[in-house]
Amino acid sequence: MSEEARETPGVHNPHVIDLISLDPEANEVVLLMLEERPWGTVPNQLDQLDDKYNSYISYVLDGHLAKQPPQYADKAVRIQLDCASPPGSREQVRINAMRNFAVSERLRFRMSVIVAQDPS
């Protein structure tokens, strides 16, 4: 895999944490997964989502997040999936399973549909 491919954010790349930020209102560390492709446009899209999600779960549960800057210490963790289109029924089943697993590990999970801004 090329260096550029490893560094490209998005659900298609499980080797990258797309974004880590603080949500001061919720007092949470947010690990963002970004899916810019419409659901169902790539045959292995759900497998890619699984791989990305599992990487994020491992990053948190294996203690890698805890080694980050101190402002993340003692904060709740939310994994957030921002996607370009609403999920279909197949995708929603998978997202619900991810949410349920996250909750079982005392993590939060949120899915949001992001709407592209009209440049005009």
Task: Label every PLM stretch briefly.
Residues 43-67:
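Acidic, aromatic-enriched beta-alpha/helix-loop junctions
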Residues 44, 71-75, 90-94:
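Secreted/extracellular ectodomain signature
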Residues 20-26, 68-73:
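Short glycine/proline-enriched loop/turn "hinge" motifs that connect secondary-structure elements
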Residues 1-3:
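N-terminal targeting leaders that direct proteins to extracytoplasmic destinations
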Residues 25, 40, 116-117:
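Exposed, flexible binding/inhibitory loops of compact, secreted disulfide-stabilized domains
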Residues 5-21, 96-100, 104, 111-113:
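N-terminal intrinsically disordered, cationic/polar leader segments
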Residues 78-120:
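Helix-rich interaction surfaces within compact, conserved domain-sized segments
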Residues 29-37, 72-85:
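Short glycine-rich, basic-tinged beta-strand/loop micro-motifs
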